[in-house]
């Protein structure tokens, strides 16, 4: 998917069942807070004292649509790094589909699952872990840095 925010053009490329590539161009009214590809840097720089932060993102499902990501702090989780005890800031990321789809999706069991991300705050915030799907309908995956050790009961 490529986005030209200035022109409001979104181009998607998909592969059909017969293997042929299909290209679609959509002209959309794009919000000024569009943050595709920047979720991790945004979360790394959120204040743990903020109530919630909302940003817009385009997803290709397969037709492009604008969704809202609602990010909110969930407290801290202990972990250790090189034998030193630390605290990771945990954030929950909810996906708001909006419109009629947003109303129907939970009823028919198609609401996207929440995503959880942990960062270590400070002057230079660091990504630690993420739990959630990487694409629509994908399995819940956990992406970790290799070094930190986490409690067993942590999502």
Please give the residue ranges for each predicted region.
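Contiguous hydrophobic, core-forming segments of folded domains
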Residues: 1-63
């Amino acid at each position: 998917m490529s986005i030209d925010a200035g022109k409001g053009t979104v181009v998607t490329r998909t592969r059909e069942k017969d293997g042929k590539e299909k290209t679609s161009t959509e002209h959309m009214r794009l919000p000024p807070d569009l943050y595709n590809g920047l979720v991790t840097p945004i979360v790394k720089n959120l204040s743990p004292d903020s109530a919630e932060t909302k940003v817009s993102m385009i997803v290709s499902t397969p037709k492009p649509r604008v969704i809202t990501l609602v990010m909110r702090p969930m407290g801290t989780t202990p972990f250790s790094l090189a034998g030193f005890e630390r605290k990771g800031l945990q954030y929950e990321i909810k996906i708001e589909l909006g419109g009629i789809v947003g109303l129907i999706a939970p009823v028919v069991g198609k609401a996207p699952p929440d995503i959880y991300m942990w960062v270590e705050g400070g002057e230079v915030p660091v990504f630690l872990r993420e739990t959630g799907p990487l694409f629509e309908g994908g399995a819940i995956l956990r992406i970790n840095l290799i070094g930190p050790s986490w409690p067993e009961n942590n999502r």
